[in-house]
Amino acid sequence: MTYLGSIEALLFVAGEDGLSLRQMAELLSLTPSALIQQLEKLAKRYEEDDDSSLLLLETAQTYKLVTKDSYMTLLRDYAKAPINQSLSRASLEVLSIIAYKQPITRIEIDDIRGVNSSGAITRLIAFGLIKEAGKKEVLGRPNLYETTNYFLDYMGINQLDDLIDASSIELVDEEVSLFSMDSINTEDKENNEN
């Protein structure tokens, strides 16, 4: 593993939230000055590589990967693709969480899902199904997300109250848990005892 590769991997996973200089320095066990040198190398590599669509963006000592302006038309065309063919299971999962828990931060979504949701959020914003809804008044002031009017149109509903009751969804989860390995193992033990 190289420092440049490690930085790139961290920034890719961090998504639109990016990472602070301090966070990366701690993760990579580098001094801030050594990390800045590596970040400058990575930024230069992206700027000079015509075959790369990426740039390294720094704002208030927070770094993230973004696409070059020359790829904007392509990305707009991609975002206009038919949604029913383009939404992944992860995107649908994130969209459901936002619909029922809005406004909600990416970190809160990640906690519910157990995995990073940056890519799905970016895609849902590009499709116009969700939007940023301000900042949460906590340390770091993370973005809040909520659904859009287009989401309501796409779902064929007039208001969020028209969504299926969330408690019925939880019931399905409870039913699914009946088939977990724990309940099967318990049944086997009971049968063996009889």
From Swiss-Prot:
Which controlled-vocabulary keywords does the entry list?
Answer: Cell cycle, Cell division, Chromosome partition, Cytoplasm
Instruction: Report whether Nucleotide-binding shows up as a keyword of the record.
Output: no
Source organism superkingdom? Bacteria
User: One GO CC term of this entry?
Assistant: cytoplasm
What compartments host this protein? Answer: Cytoplasm
Q: Which InterPro entries would you find in this protein's record? A: ScpB_csome_segregation, WH-like_DNA-bd_sf, WH_DNA-bd_sf
GO terms under biological process: cell division; chromosome separation; DNA replication
Q: Which residues form the signal peptide?
A: none
Keyword Amino-acid biosynthesis assigned to the entry: answer is no
Main subcellular location: cytoplasm
Subunit architecture: Homodimer. Homodimerization may be required to stabilize the binding of ScpA to the Smc head domains. Component of a cohesin-like complex composed of ScpA, ScpB and the Smc homodimer, in which ScpA and ScpB bind to the head domain of Smc. The presence of the three proteins is required for the association of the complex with DNA.
> Which PANTHER family does its entry note?
SEGREGATION AND CONDENSATION PROTEIN B
Q: Which family does it belong to?
A: Belongs to the ScpB family.
* Reported function: Participates in chromosomal partition during cell division. May act via the formation of a condensin-like complex containing Smc and ScpA that pull DNA away from mid-cell into both cell halves.
Q: Which NCBIfam families match?
A: SMC-Scp complex subunit ScpB
What protein name does the entry list?
Segregation and condensation protein B
Recorded source organism is Streptococcus agalactiae serotype V (strain ATCC BAA-611 / 2603 V/R)
Write the gene name.
Answer: scpB
